[in-house]
Amino acid sequence: MIVDLPLRRIQQFARLGAKHQSSVLIRLHTKGGIVGIGESITPCGPWWSGDSVEAIQATINHYLAPLVVGEPALDASRIMAKLHGRVAGNAFAKAGIEMALLDAVGKIVDAPIHVLLGGRFRDRLSVAWPLATGDVNQEVDEAFRMLEAGKAGAFKLKMGALPLAQDLRRALAIAKELEGKASLRVDPNEAWDEPTTMRALAPLEAAGVEIIEQPVARWNLDAMARIHRQARSMLLIDEGVQSLHDASEVVKRAAAGLVSLKIMKTGGMRPARAMADIANAGGMHVYMGTFLETSIGTAANMQLAASIESLPYGGEVIGPLLIEEDLCEVPAVYKEHALWLPEGPGLGIRLDENQVRRFARASSQRIDRHSA
């Protein structure tokens, strides 16, 4: 089923803003009575990847779920290989199914998913909060509220929706207010071209901006490589690295210093974990990105993060802080400027069925499939 959840404020990206977040909720029932939970989620409809929750739901119902029904849940790797062999692309839909499978497997063997991914390196992840209203005063106030509440210790400014000169004034003003208190990163979401990015580097770096994320179009790895050679700030690639092949190309071309991991874009936790290994082998660090997941997907992100040795810049897994309502009995825990690993088998979460019913889209078809 699709659930539609309100946001606490508009989340402004370079090209559009989100007022709510929609998620495809997936339940996988085993013959032994275990229920695996997953979600597929994408912000603002199809602008980021071409996927929408409506298309994701249809793909799962008509093409992916029939390939899963009757299979042993413990054979999660083989099941996912089967899906990849029969259905091209559709990473977001596949990620939700893999999440439900791994949640079920974890519950069957009584172990959290990070154990299935190789074990735990950490129980918390430092959090960066997105500043995305476009108003400097509001953004500064929001940053200090998050700092004082212990929810986040770094901030990422969404850029690209305003003219460059105005955006730079905004960034420099916020950097000045945060100086000595918190670090600042910026994300133009592909809105700039290479010359614009080169013009922006000097003032941003002089202001102490530590990360610049995906300034140019996702396909332009050559430009990313040139920017990376020029920049003193860490260059983070996101839209430009969505598959394991993409990751190998980024390493080969030295097109960034930091790779954004997102479970949805890679098609699941296991391919995201493999992407981290490719990046690390190429001398790059990784970063936990977000698609504004609910506490379901946030738990999956934290299970993945727990299994990764080095995350020097943490991540921005902040969906439950921005989404006004939650689908879990115990929402994700944020304290000491970090997201904490949930306890328990699988994802470590339990659905709040009243909340699910409250926010379920009336026309949504339930995705409720049975495995072995």
Swiss-Prot record:
GO biological process, one term: amino acid catabolic process
Record SUPFAM superfamilies: Enolase C-terminal domain-like, Enolase N-terminal domain-like
Pfam family, one: MR_MLE_N
Names of the cofactor(s): Mn(2+)
Coiled-coil zones: none
Binding site for Mn(2+): D187, E213, D238
Active-site annotation: K158, E316
Family from the record: Belongs to the mandelate racemase/muconate lactonizing enzyme family.
Listed name of the protein: Chloromuconate cycloisomerase
Name of the gene: tfdDII
